[in-house]
A protein has these predicted regions:
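Structural alpha/beta surface segment adjacent to cysteine/selenocysteine redox centers
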Residues: 95, 100, 106-180, 186, ...
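Soluble non-cytosolic domains of exported or imported proteins
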Residues: 32-36, 47, 103-106, 133-137, ...
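Envelope-exposed proteins and targeting segments
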Residues: 90-93, 120, 219
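A short beta-strand-turn-helix
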Residues: 75-92
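N-terminal targeting signals for export/organelle localization
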Residues: 2-10, 17-73
């Protein structure tokens, strides 16, 4: 978002460019002294018309916020690289930002699964956001590599139900348990696609002002923190009703 001083500067510059580019004056018709005089006229006008200046700045801010919002949610809706659970064709999408070392995320796991079981028309998009430690990053890379073998859900569930330190040894053991091809897994962990997916999620989290996990986005609603089953189903119903 623009600061007030930046907006003031932007307004002044916009007025100057407007006059410079208008057909009223020939191209390059201002000399240095005229430009200084013109800047002084603008400064005086701004000082004498603070309400009008505020109105213009408010409009600029509103448009900037709208553009930011639209671009962010457009970016969010492009989730082709993210894992999906629930109904892939669901009429309501729940985005969950989580970290595998987040205790609240693990507590919320059963809540989310139960909600998906009760509401069969909800699509869950899982946004890997490893922000707590290096083991969080490693776990996310393993999980997204498991997606390439169509075993993300199984591997994700294993990690979410695990209590303890997520060492690589533990992650490889889980990979074996769910039937992953270990050699392919090792290769896929190095893929640029996985790096880009996680980087995009971090950018999205920043744009959405998400600073912790778990966080949910349902419709245009951003919900920080864990939800109980009733709360989650209530948000889903609310968004569904708004969309109908």
């Amino acid at each position: 978002m623009f600061s007030f001083k930046r907006n003031l500067w932007f307004l002044t510059l916009s007025l100057f460019v407007l006059f410079q580019s208008s057909n009223v004056f020939p191209q390059n018709s201002f000399n240095e002294n005229q430009i200084k005089d013109f800047e002084k006229i603008i400064e005086n006008w701004i000082e004498k018309n603070p309400k009008k200046v505020k109105q213009v700045l408010d409009k600029l801010l509103a448009q900037e916020e709208k553009n930011h919002h639209n671009k962010t949610f457009e970016m969010l809706s492009d989730h082709s690289m993210d894992p999906v659970m629930g109904n892939p064709e669901g009429d309501v999408i729940v985005y969950e930002f989580f970290d595998y070392n987040c205790g609240y995320c693990k507590s919320a796991f059963n809540t989310v699964i139960k909600a998906l079981d009760k509401d069969k028309n909800t699509k869950l998009v899982l946004k890997e956001l490893p922000i707590l430690s290096q083991t969080s990053i490693n776990a996310s890379f393993f999980a997204l590599a498991a997606k390439k073998q169509n075993l993300y859900s199984e591997f994700h569930t294993k990690i979410m139900l695990f209590r303890g330190r997520l060492t690589d040894e533990i992650l490889f053991r889980m990979a074996n348990q769910v039937g992953l091809d270990i050699e392919k897994l090792k290769k896929d962990i190095q893929s640029d696609e996985i790096k880009l997916t996680i980087e995009k999620n971090k950018i999205l989290a920043e744009r959405l002002n998400i600073t912790g996990t778990p966080s949910f986005v349902i419709g245009n609603i951003i919900i920080p923190g864990a939800l109980n089953e009733e709360q989650l189903l209530k948000y889903i119903k609310k968004v569904r009703n708004e969309n109908s």
